[in-house]
């Protein structure tokens, strides 16, 4: 990865290179939070499903479900585990939204300032190769501002 950034020296100056590296870091941070959110959502769904299955198997009659839940601490533990997993997924969802906003703002800033970042005509042609590399290596679209 370092050699890739060294290749950019011929196409960009140091501040532009720093902006692109910051953009890649924000993209990785956003993807990390998205993966954590998915993981915890699945964990909460599995916990809820197991809780429902255990209650349906153990409960003799539908009228006694509440009594069955309150009389065994095992069910309370599973309820707490489900609530914890859901709250953690909610926390990571908020972090994901914030990191996506930060990533999108920096991406739009680079797109809007591209005329300042590559002012000379020969550098402007090199901009295309930088944008192409960012699109194919990191899946970051610098051609358009839309998400």
UniProtKB/Swiss-Prot annotation:
Tree of life domain: Bacteria
Keyword Transmembrane attached: yes
GO terms under cellular component: plasma membrane
Recorded topology in the membrane: Multi-pass membrane protein
Compartmental location: Cell membrane
Transmembrane segments: 42-62, 64-84
Record's keyword terms, sorted: Cell membrane, Membrane, Transmembrane, Transmembrane helix
Pfam families, sorted: DUF2663
Protein name, per record: Uncharacterized protein YpbF
Organism: Bacillus subtilis (strain 168)
Underlying gene: ypbF
């Amino acid at each position: 990865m370092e050699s890739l950034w060294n290749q950019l020296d011929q196409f960009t100056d140091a501040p532009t290179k720093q902006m692109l590296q910051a953009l890649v870091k924000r993209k990785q941070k956003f993807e990390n939070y998205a993966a954590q959110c998915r993981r915890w959502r699945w964990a909460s769904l599995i916990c809820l499903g197991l809780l429902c299955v255990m209650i349906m198997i153990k409960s003799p009659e539908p009228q006694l479900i509440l009594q069955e839940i309150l009389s065994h601490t095992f069910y309370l533990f599973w309820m707490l585990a489900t609530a914890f997993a859901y709250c953690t997924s909610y926390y990571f969802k908020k972090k994901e939204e914030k990191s996506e906003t930060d990533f999108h703002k920096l991406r739009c800033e680079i797109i809007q300032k591209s005329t300042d970042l590559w002012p000379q005509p020969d550098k402007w042609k090199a901009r295309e190769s930088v944008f192409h590399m960012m699109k194919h290596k990191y899946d970051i679209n610098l051609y358009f501002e839309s998400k």
